[in-house]
Amino acid sequence: MANAFADSGWSVTVVSLADSSWEIENGTDQSLLVGLNTAIERVPVNLRREDFEPIIGRWTPLHARNPDRWKAQFLKRTTREFPEKIFGAWRTPLIEAVSAVYRTKPADLLIVSPAPYTTLAVAEALHRQFSIPYVVDYRDGWSVDVVNGGSAFDVGSKQDRIEREVLKNASAAWFVNERIMEFYKDRYPESSTKFSVVRNGYDSSAVAQITPHIPAGSPLSFGYLGTMNLALPQLRNLLEGWRLARESVPGLKDARLEFRGHVGAGYASGAGGHARLISEFSDCGVSYGGPVAKSDVAAVYSQWNALVLALIGGEYVTSGKVYEYMATGLPILSVHERHHAACDVLNGYPLWALAEPSSPESVAAGFTEISQVAHRFDQDSLKKALEHANSFEYKRSMSGVLDEANAIAQAPVALPSHTSSEQVLLQPYQDVEIPAKPVVTLIAAQKIIATTLEKNIPLLLAAGCEVRLITFHDPHSALNGIDLALQRLTLQAFKRGRSKATRVIKRNVLAPFSSLIMKVLKLPRRVDLLICMDPTLDEWIATTDVFVALDRYAAYAARNCSKRSGQAVAILGMREITRLVTSSTQQG
């Protein structure tokens, strides 16, 4: 959208979170900036999610000792200024940040794009203070529960009063599909004349280089690309259905299913429940390959014979990914409710099959159907598929948007004589410093996901690190999904040029009290106590540079180990230590 405005002569300033803020959640993709109009000014705001803070030394004692209790208090605290969990606490700093931009560079039009819905408070505040007209660009509706249907909050609630007032004063409101817009028209009839649909669409630059290949006797390859937000039961049905189809359909023998994109966020990126579930099906050709940079999207799509569009929700969820999927011209298997809003877009696409996610059997039937489509795939079917997809190219929907914006603002301002991306709002985030080639000790309170170790430990070793692991689960067994009893503490050291060596420490001294410990102490303190009482770990603690908690229940032990060391840093998550080590290596 920013490009469309800049290309048509508008002076565009984009206020968004700083890269360091995105980094701790899902990472950053610098290739997204390729093709961005150079006249667009980017202003980063240094706001970070406290619940994703990876530096454990910055945590409160309660956060480390009892992360579940801290999270409950944190969520309650964030809604004091604005009724939105997590992001409500950003209301005041966001208003101050955008107001500072406006004072430096007055604008003719403000566009806010929730979620988060705290941006609605920004629009209302700047309109009240500076009389600037604004548009609400809803990528997700607030008052509508897009996942379960119906209302997300009651009429007359605090959220309802805020949204009603914001829409009353807005110059326009844009929605991603007709169904959400109709919901809003029924709920806020006094503002309904301002509402219109601005669909998502696909970026032709991201998919223009795709060269779909036609299977010629080789096993079929299916792909899922996107942010994984399926409920675990829905994901399990998808995977069980895949297993059933692969075992029973000759055309799916030796077929593979690859997941790409973001699975989990923060410390759990690639290491949470979804990643664990995916890894359980590795024996039937299922794998997770990590996020994909925008510059690599076309190449990834070209590796697959068919796509899997697995979506949550129903009649209100379109998903921006459906447009990009169609733009490939590949066969698409939808795994979602029959009355899903994505069907409005896919109807007429000639290479489409629908499977409801209610059972593995229904999903298996969908894989069977789409495998037949994939085997019949030819240049003629590709041409027909692309004819349907072309009508959803994003630029096609922007002409009406620009006309409406011009009418609201009367005329765009002149392009600036220079641009700057150096302005940073609020105190910049200070990264933690670690030594070159550090000694890294990993601590896991919960079962380890094999892919977490397999992907990141080689990167750390290649950077010259010495890596150690303290866990309640034997790493060899954990890789196969087998846990050890809590009466054993397993230690494993990884060193360059050495084979893996495992020592099992019997904690006989705790045996008489094990049941009492299990009942009285919560997992974070239990892990810390067991490490503290093991004298064989003293040397490790004294010689470690960075303690890494692999899960939030190990953070308390990592925090206290760093204090006992007197010199070590404690952080959360394999992704964060890998980022710090690789960035340190690049700088060196």
Describe these PLM feature segments.
Residues M1-E50, A172, P189, A245, ...:
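N-terminal subdomain of nucleotide-sugar transferases
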Residues S16-T92, S477-R525:
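A conserved catalytic-core segment of Leloir-type glycosyltransferases
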Residues K85, S99, T118-A121, A125-Q129, ...:
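Membrane-proximal helix-turn-helix segments that form the acceptor-binding/catalytic region
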Residues S171, D283, S287, A299-Y316, ...:
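Acidic donor-binding loop of glycosyltransferase active sites
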Residues I214-P233, L239-W242:
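Conserved donor-binding/catalytic core segment of Leloir-type glycosyltransferases
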Residues V249, D254, E258-V263, A268-D296, ...:
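Nucleotide-activated donor-binding/catalytic signature segment of Leloir-type glycosyltransferases, i.e.
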Residues S358-A364, H375-A405:
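A charged, aromatic-enriched C-terminal amphipathic alpha-helix characteristic of glycosyltransferases
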